[in-house]
């Protein structure tokens, strides 16, 4: 079994535990007032592969991570599997004294590097921490210390926040380095509509500030499917799918999604 296969097995455990944590909080655990607890299963599922790879393969001791708020169930699941979180805390997720809704350095017991919330502050903090790290290194306050990578796991809706763009400007002024922003572009937002063409607009913003931009869009199975007869039509359908249709089909489920793709691809074949 190679490393990728091992990571896939870990990923399944992390995803199951994260989803169970939310399900338990909403449907199993005693709820005296009957109010919905929430927990963001979709926002957790959309980044579980990336977080599994980071925490079980890529991160070094000197690296620091700002986890997007709506991925806290995945973070707590990873910490639990690593022996840094307790069963009691995850059973009481989003409850009094339990694992926090958003990763918190002051309220959580697991290994939170940067407290994050719903206003994008964790994103900007990675850039300023990196600038401070460079200042300390230049002044030689701590000699022979390896430089860490400051990593932000960013929900696409967090990029509505103005402080994110302020720190992009400051980073450009001061030759920012050793920073990764991994944007989970899942086309979902609780606070508004995700507009068409937003990904291209965001790409142009980062390019304007001289960031090294890498776009990961298609999975391995999709890339294999593109090589099959009609694969170019499938790729075009994915690229052209508007947000409204994408959201509706995700809600309807796999069979409806598959039928719509096949119906549309057949139309593409017969169109002049």
Walk through the language-model features, giving the residues of each:
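Short, contiguous pre-domain boundary segments
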Residues: 1-3
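Cofactor-binding active-site loop characterized by glycine-rich and histidine/acidic residues
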Residues: 6-10, 14, 18, 22-30, ...
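Short internal beta-strands
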Residues: 66-68, 178-185
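Residues at the starts of beta-strands that form the adenosine-phosphate
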Residues: 149, 178-180, 212
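Long, well-ordered, tryptophan-enriched scaffold segments
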Residues: 185-271
């Amino acid at each position: 079994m190679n490393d990728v296969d091992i990571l896939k097995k870990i990923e399944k455990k992390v995803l199951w535990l994260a989803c169970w944590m939310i399900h338990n909080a909403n449907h199993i655990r005693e709820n005296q007032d009957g109010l919905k607890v929430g927990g963001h299963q979709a926002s957790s599922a959309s980044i579980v592969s990336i977080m599994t790879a980071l925490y079980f393969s890529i991160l070094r001791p000197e690296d620091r991570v700002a986890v997007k708020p709506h991925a806290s169930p995945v973070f707590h699941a990873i910490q639990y599997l690593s022996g840094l979180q307790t069963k009691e805390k995850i059973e009481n997720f989003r409850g009094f004294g339990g694992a926090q809704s958003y990763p918190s350095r002051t309220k959580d017991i697991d290994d939170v590097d940067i407290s994050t919330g719903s206003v994008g502050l964790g994103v900007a903090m990675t850039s300023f921490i990196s600038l401070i790290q460079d200042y300390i290194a230049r002044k030689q306050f701590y000699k022979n210390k390896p430089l860490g990578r400051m990593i932000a796991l960013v929900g696409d809706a967090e990029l509505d926040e103005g402080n994110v763009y302020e720190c992009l400007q400051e980073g450009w002024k001061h030759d920012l380095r050793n920073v990764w922003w991994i944007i989970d572009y899942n086309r979902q937002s609780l606070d508004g509509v995700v507009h068409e063409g937003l990904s291209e607009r965001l790409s142009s913003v980062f390019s304007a500030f001289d960031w090294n931009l890498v776009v990961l869009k298609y999975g391995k199975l999709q890339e294999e499917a593109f090589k099959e007869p009609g694969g170019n039509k499938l790729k075009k359908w994915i690229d052209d799918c508007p947000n409204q249709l994408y959201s509706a089909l995700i809600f309807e489920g796999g069979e409806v999604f598959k039928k719509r793709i096949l119906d549309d691809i057949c139309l593409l074949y017969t169109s002049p």
